[in-house]
C-alpha cells in the first residue's frame, strides 16, 4: 500500500522532515517514490510546505496519509 508520511532528515537534536510518498513496507528513512514537501518544527513559526496538487493526485490514486501529515496538510 502507498502511504504519505514524514521521513526525518537533519542532524541530531535538530529535526527536519520531508513529506514523502512511499510504500508502507519501507522503513521510515528508506527509499521513497516522490517528495512532495517539507516540515521544519524548529523554526518560528513552524515552516510547512506541501505541494497540494501532488497531494491530491496521490490521494486520488489511493495513497493513505499518516495522522501527522493529515494535521500538517490542514495547516499548510
Swiss-Prot record:
Could you give one GO CC term from the UniProt record?
cytoplasm
Q: Origin, by domain of life?
A: Bacteria
Picking any one GO molecular function of the record gives:
structural constituent of ribosome
Has UniProt tagged this entry with the keyword Translocase? no
Q: Name one GO biological process term.
A: translation
Q: What is the similarity comment for this entry?
A: Belongs to the bacterial ribosomal protein bS16 family.
Q: What is this protein called?
A: Small ribosomal subunit protein bS16
Species the sequence originates in: Helicobacter acinonychis (strain Sheeba)
Gene this chain is encoded by: rpsP
Amino acid at each position: 500500500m502507498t502511504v504519505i508520511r514524514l521521513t526525518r532528515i537533519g542532524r541530531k537534536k535538530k529535526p527536519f522532515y520531508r513529506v514523502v510518498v512511499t510504500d508502507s513496507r519501507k522503513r521510515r528513512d528508506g527509499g521513497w517514490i516522490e517528495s512532495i514537501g517539507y516540515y521544519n518544527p524548529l523554526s518560528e513559526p513552524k515552516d510547512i510546505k506541501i505541494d497540494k496538487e501532488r497531494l491530491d493526485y496521490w490521494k486520488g490514486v489511493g495513497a493513505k496519509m499518516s495522522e501527522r501529515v493529515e494535521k500538517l496538510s490542514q495547516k499548510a
